[in-house]
Amino acid sequence: KATGGTYYALKDGQPTGCNPFQLPDSPKTREFIYRLVGICGKNAEGRVTAAEEKQIQLAVDTLMNTIDFENRNFSVLLQSIPPEPTKADNLRGRLSRWCRSEGGRYAWCLDNTSNDFDPDNFYRIGFDLTDILKDDYLPTEPVLAYLFFLRDLMMTRVAAAGGILATVIEEFWYPARFKITQDFMLKILKTDRKRAGWVILTSQSPEDAINCPIFSAIVQQTPTKIFLPNPDAQYERSYDQTGITQKEYDELVKLTLESRTFLIRQSRQSAFATLNLYGFDDEMAVLSGSSRNVAILDDIQDEMGDVSVDMWYPVFKDRVRQARQAKRQKAA
């Protein structure tokens, strides 16, 4: 947002502005929507039956072929799913959880009156998914899938224009839990570099990254790796799977967290580098967000509305400084 982009914080229980049925229609979009609706309609075993897949396909095709663009949504789609009153567990009942017309608990996720996310208009965009990324939480997988699909559409547009698209996936191991987002991530790694797309995958916990189901593919497809200090690290069954040598590891674990030094490894070459950002307090409030600073930004936006960065950023800096000073005085 500070560089002229758009920043969205998706909040649990609040309308996301996501409506996949109002994306531009194409065979690619339809295939994605079939799969997305199937994810929302999974039974207790985590799947839909072949007959249910057919119902989903017919319902999606009916919606996209016969309903005006502005009226396409999850609730209208549900009208094409036949009720099965003799079955306690049925597709219509499962999909009702995602529909406003049924008072569905998760209707805020994908059943919005309009789609606020047009990949043709994206330039720089960021999403805060802190509220959405939860274990055993039904909205996590479909919301992630939708955002990854938007990114895929954006990549197609940027590639056609001869541009470059950079993607940063924080805590990448979390979306890699799900098959649909695994597929998107592998596509990014394997094919998007040919379309001038590149990706940064980050994780605060090496163990979470290493336990990722597609970690071996990620290691093979990422030529450059950066390792931050981790004095408590282990080599065997941990860092040895990342491709660094024992010698590199031995030097890495000697580093303290305060050293500001890290290991860069590319192919068979490696080097240690230092990045000291002392004195960059104002900039760090933007480069590395915190819940406190995000709350400050939210308050400013509520007060000032959607104004240019030149107007809100000076106010943001002042309030962050005030909050920092108040914290220091309290600790003194």
Report the location of each language-model feature.
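P-loop NTPase motor domains
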Residues: K1-G197, I210, V253-L257, F262, ...
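H-loop/switch region of ABC-family ATPase nucleotide-binding domains
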Residues: S203
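Aromatic-lined carbohydrate-recognition surfaces of secreted/lumenal glycan-active proteins
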Residues: P206
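C-terminal regions of RecA-like/P-loop NTPase motor modules
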Residues: A209-A332
